[in-house]
């Protein structure tokens, strides 16, 4: 049996402000740093150790990983950083407040933009300074692979090559792997691992800073999965994620 641990980054500044973040490179809040520290302490307390870790090129995920590994006294762990683990690109929605957007367009439309499998928000213009082609960290990525917007289907198509070429072979080689990434890049992995339907993936919410353990058989098929930590706290965090895209009630 193999084990894989997935972890969404701790609370970011735009999580706190309830804004669509996507590829915008915002940092963790103090709460987010504390979540990462507690996650690392929990992993250490439960006896977890890792031979290899992976994360995205966005600082909120990188810093979460650093803090967690530091709390485990394991900052020597080799880390692979790859753009394919980035958050889903939210196009023109990036930077907008989710509740205000819901008040303008309706809860249902925002839920579609946030969670529908094959519907993407309006793309960024090619000349928009927020377009990733203007960001030096993507300079070596072919221009036709850089998104101006994405739906979850697009995110799955981006993430799975990295799973197939890097993460899965490492697990099969017996390496203990931790992936610190983002809500939607992790949903892409979960959809693949659990064979979640396009409709059901809409209801999958991943809380920040909570280690999610997958026990896998020799074919990397899930035997079971579970969050470490307090169940009530995790349920509340998942409910909070689900509520982010709803208009505020007076």
UniProtKB/Swiss-Prot annotation:
One of its GO terms (biological process) is gluconeogenesis. SMART domains: PGAM. Gene3D superfamilies: Phosphoglycerate mutase-like. Pathway: Carbohydrate degradation; glycolysis; pyruvate from D-glyceraldehyde 3-phosphate: step 3/5. It is an enzyme of class 5 (isomerase). InterPro entries: His_Pase_superF_clade-1, His_PPase_superfam, PG/BPGM_mutase_AS, Phosphogly_mut1. The keyword Isomerase applies. Keywords: Gluconeogenesis, Glycolysis, Isomerase. Its EC number is 5.4.2.11. Catalyzes the interconversion of 2-phosphoglycerate and 3-phosphoglycerate. PANTHER family: PHOSPHOGLYCERATE MUTASE. Belongs to the phosphoglycerate mutase family. BPG-dependent PGAM subfamily. This is 2,3-bisphosphoglycerate-dependent phosphoglycerate mutase. It comes from Bordetella pertussis (strain Tohama I / ATCC BAA-589 / NCTC 13251).
């Amino acid at each position: 049996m193999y084990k894989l641990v997935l972890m969404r980054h701790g609370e970011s500044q735009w999580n706190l402000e309830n804004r669509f973040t996507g590829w915008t490179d915002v940092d963790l809040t103090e709460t987010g740093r504390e979540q990462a520290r507690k996650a690392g302490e929990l992993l250490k307390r439960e006896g977890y150790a890792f031979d290899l870790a992976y994360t995205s090129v966005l600082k909120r995920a990188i810093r979460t990983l650093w803090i967690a590994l530091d709390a485990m006294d394991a900052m020597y762990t080799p880390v692979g950083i790859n753009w394919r683990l980035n958050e889903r690109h939210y196009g023109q929605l990036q930077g907008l407040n989710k509740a205000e957007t819901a008040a303008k367009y309706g809860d249902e439309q925002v839920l579609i933009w946030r969670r529908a499998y094959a519907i993407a928000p309006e793309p960024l213009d090619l000349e928009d300074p927020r377009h990733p082609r203007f960001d030096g960290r993507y300079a070596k990525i072919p221009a036709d692979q850089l998104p101006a917007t994405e739906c979850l289907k697009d995110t799955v198509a981006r993430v799975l090559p990295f799973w197939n070429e890097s993460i899965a072979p490492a697990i099969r080689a017996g390496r203990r792997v931790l992936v610190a990434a983002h809500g939607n890049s992790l949903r892409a992995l979960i959809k693949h691992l659990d064979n979640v339907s396009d409709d059901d993936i809409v209801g999958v919410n991943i809380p920040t800073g909570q280690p999610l353990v997958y026990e896998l058989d020799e074919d990397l098929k899930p035997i079971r999965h579970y969050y470490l930590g307090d169940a009530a706290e995790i349920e509340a965090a998942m409910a909070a994620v689900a509520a982010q895209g709803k208009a505020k009630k007076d």
